[in-house]
Amino acid sequence: MQLINVIKSSGVSQSFDPQKIIKVLSWAAEGTSVDPYELYENIKSYLRDGMTTDDIQTIVIKAAANSISVEEPDYQYVAARCLMFALRKHVYGQYEPRSFIDHISYCVNAGKYDPELLSKYSAEEITFLESKIKHERDMEFTYSGAMQLKEKYLVKDKTTGQIYETPQFAFMTIGMALHQDEPVDRLKHVIRFYEAVSTRQISLPTPIMAGCRTPTRQFSSCVVIEAGDSLKSINKASASIVEYISKRAGIGINVGMIRAEGSKIGMGEVRHTGVIPFWKHFQTAVKSCSQGGIRGGAATAYYPIWHLEVENLLVLKNNKGVEENRIRHMDYGVQLNDLMMERFGKNDYITLFSPHEMGGELYYSYFKDQDRFRELYEAAEKDPNIRKKRIKARELFELLMTERSGTARIYVQFIDNTNNYTPFIREKAPIRQSNLCCEIAIPTNDVNSPDAEIGLCTLSAFVLDNFDWQDQDKINELAEVQVRALDNLLDYQGYPVPEAEKAKKRRNLGVGVTNYAAWLASNFASYEDANDLTHELFERLQYGLIKASIKLAKEKGPSEYYSDTRWSRGELPIDWYNKKIDQIAAPKYVCDWSALREDLKLFGIRNSTLSALMPCESSSQVSNSTNGYEPPRGPVSVKESKEGSFNQVVPNIEHNIDLYDYTWKLAKKGNKPYLTQVAIMLKWVCQSASANTYYDPQIFPKGKVPMSIMIDDMLYGWYYGIKNFYYHNTRDGSGTDDYEIETPKADDCAACKL
C-alpha cells in the first residue's frame, strides 16, 4: 500500500499509520469471532490520500456493517463498537465522556435538557449517580441498536444533526427526569430504573426515549379521542388531534357517532352531508403537523359495522374510486359485537342505521350494555319510522374481509370482548374505541360533552429472554421499576388540552412484552405447543404488575377513578377473563392470587390498567429483540437508515437459528397457533393486543386465500376473546418476504409502538 496522509479532526495532516486502525479494530473485535486483520484487508482498498479520520471511521463502520450475516453475526457487535467509538469522539471530542454534571450543564445551557435536572438534583447527588453509570455498556449494543439510538433516540439538533449525548447518559437522565419528585429513596429508584434500561431488561417507547429529559413534556404513547355528532365536537376533536400530532403522538379517533348522509338536522330544514366530509377534515388534521419534526401524523378511525354508510366507508382506503369518495391516509377500525357475529353465524341479515337514531341510545348501548343494545336494535329493525337498510351478514363480512386483505389496514375490534374482559366496569366506563395500533382499550368521552375525556396511555415492555422468567422476585422488581416510572410520568408531563388531564385520574399504563419469539426458541417451544408456557409467563408478568401497583397505591393512594374498575370490587384477571380460554390452557396458577386479592381489598390499586401488547418495531432494535410477540420473517432482517441498509440477525442466532418459528413457515400451518398464544396472553392483559394475521397465497389453490379461511380466523379470534385484529399480512412471493425489510411506512407512527 502506497504512503498516504490523513487529516485529523484538528486539521493537521499526518502520515497514515496502519497500526492505529488495527489497534482500534482489535479492540472492537475483542471477545468476538471476527478477525481484525481480515477486516482491515477489506478496508484497505477504500483508503485514499487526504482522507479525514472521520472518513476512515465511516469506512470502518460500513465495512463491518456490510459483513453482518447468518454466518458472521459477530460483525454486528464490531460495527456497533466502531460506531460508538466514533460517536464518543463527535460528542465529547475524545473517547472518554466528560463528567456527568458538566454534561448536564452543557446540555441545559444548549437548551437540549430540562433545567430541572439541575434544580431538582444537587451536585452531590449527580456525582453519586455518575458513580453508578457503566459506560462500557455502550459497547454491548448490536449495530442495529446503536444506529437506532444514534438516528432516533439520542438528543440532537435536528437542523445541524449535532448529537449531544451517549446512551448511558441518556438512560440515567431519563431516570432522573421520571423520578425527580419522588419524596423517598429517590436515588435508589433512579438507579434501579437505569439498571433495568441499560441492561435491556425493559424497553421504552419512542416519546420517552427521545423526549424525556428534554424541555418537551408530552410522552403518552397513545392518544384516543372521541368525536360526537355536533360541529362543535367535530372541530374540538380536530383541534385536539392537531395538538397531539405536533407532540409526536399516534391517534385513535372514534368517529362512529357522526350521523349518516341524508339524516335530518334540527327540525329537518337541512339534510346531513354524511361522514365522509368530516372524516376528510380529520385526515387533514392528522397530516397537518409532522411528528416532532419526523413526518406527518397517523390515525385510525373507529366506527360500528351497522353504520348506515358502512358500504361506502369500508372502501375508503382502497385504490379504486376518486379522491372525493376516498380517504386513504387514515386507517380504519370496524367494530363488531356478539350480535353481529351471531347474525353472520345464522346467515341472517344485519340492519344498518344512522348512529344518531333513538337519540343516540342505540349507539351508546352498543358499548355499554350488550343486552340493552340487542333490545334497542331489534326494536329499531321493526320501527317503520326509522331509516334503515338490510344487508346479508355474510355479504357485509365478505366486503370487510375483501377490503382488509386488499389494503392490509382495515382493522377489526370486537366490542363485547373489549368491554367484557377488562378491568373497567362496563356500565360505568365503557370502551368505545382503540388506538392507532389496536392495543389500547380505555374509556373516552365526547370531547365536547360535560364529561369530556381524551384517553391517554403510557407504554413500556419486558424484554423477554433477558431475565429469568421463572424468578418471580426478579419479575416483581422489573414490574415495580416500570409501574413507578410510568406512573410518575403522568404527573411529570404536560397536557396540551384539558380533556386529557383525566389521564391523571385513571392512571392507565400499558406494559407489554418484546422478544417473545426468541424466548420461545430459548425454551425449545413453538407457537404450536407453548400454551401452558405462555399461560405461566403472562400470569407471572401480570401478577408482578398488579403487585407493584398495589404497593404504589399503599404509598401514594389508589387512582381517583378507582371505583370505575373491577379492582374496586376485589376482582382480578382470574375472575373476568373469557372462560373459553380454559379449553386451550388449563387454569393452573403458580402465583398466590388469594394473598394478592387481600392486599387489593386493603390498599386498592394505583393504576386502572397495567398491561397492553403493542408492536415493538423500533425499540426491539435497541434491545436486540424480536418484535413484540410476533414471529420474525427470517433469521436476517434488513434495516434501512440514513446511511444505507444493513442486516440484523435474530437474537442468539448461533445457537437458536433452527429453533425459531419464522413467519411464513408458521403461516403454512395457518394463523391459529399464533392467535392461540395471543388469546392466552389476553387472559391476563388489561387492555388489548395488536394481533396480526399472515397469509401465503402460494399454499392455496389458484394462489388465492379463500374467504372462508380469513373469516374462520376472525371467528376463532373472537371466540377465544381476542379484542382487535391489526395488520393483514400477505406474502407477495417476491423472495424478499423471508427477510424483514424495514423502511418507514407512510401513515405510520412510532409513538404508540415501542
Swiss-Prot record:
One of its GO terms (molecular function) is ATP binding. One of its GO terms (cellular component) is ribonucleoside-diphosphate reductase complex. Residues 621-641 are annotated as: Disordered. PROSITE patterns: ATP_CONE, RIBORED_LARGE. It holds the Pfam family Ribonuc_red_lgC. The record marks D229, R259 as: Allosteric effector binding. The keyword ATP-binding applies. Residues 4-93 form the ATP-cone domain. Under complex allosteric control mediated by deoxynucleoside triphosphates and ATP binding. The type of nucleotide bound at the specificity site determines substrate preference. It seems probable that ATP makes the enzyme reduce CDP and UDP, dGTP favors ADP reduction and dTTP favors GDP reduction. Its EC number is 1.17.4.1. It is an enzyme of class 1 (oxidoreductase). The record marks Y726, Y727 as: Important for electron transfer. It catalyses: a 2'-deoxyribonucleoside 5'-diphosphate + [thioredoxin]-disulfide + H2O = a ribonucleoside 5'-diphosphate + [thioredoxin]-dithiol. Disulfide bonds join C222-C457. GO terms for biological process: deoxyribonucleotide biosynthetic process. The active site is at N435, C437, E439. Keywords: Allosteric enzyme, ATP-binding, Deoxyribonucleotide synthesis, Disulfide bond, Nucleotide-binding, Oxidoreductase. SUPFAM superfamilies: PFL-like glycyl radical enzymes, R1 subunit of ribonucleotide reductase, N-terminal domain. Substrate binds at T206, S221, C222, G250, N435, L436, C437, C438, E439, P615, C616, E617, S618, S619. The record marks C222, C457 as: Important for hydrogen atom transfer. Provides the precursors necessary for DNA synthesis. Catalyzes the biosynthesis of deoxyribonucleotides from the corresponding ribonucleotides. Heterodimer of a large and a small subunit. Belongs to the ribonucleoside diphosphate reductase large chain family. This is Ribonucleoside-diphosphate reductase subunit alpha. It comes from Enterobacteria phage T4 (Bacteriophage T4). The lineage of its organism: Viruses, Duplodnaviria, Heunggongvirae, Uroviricota, Caudoviricetes. The gene is NRDA.
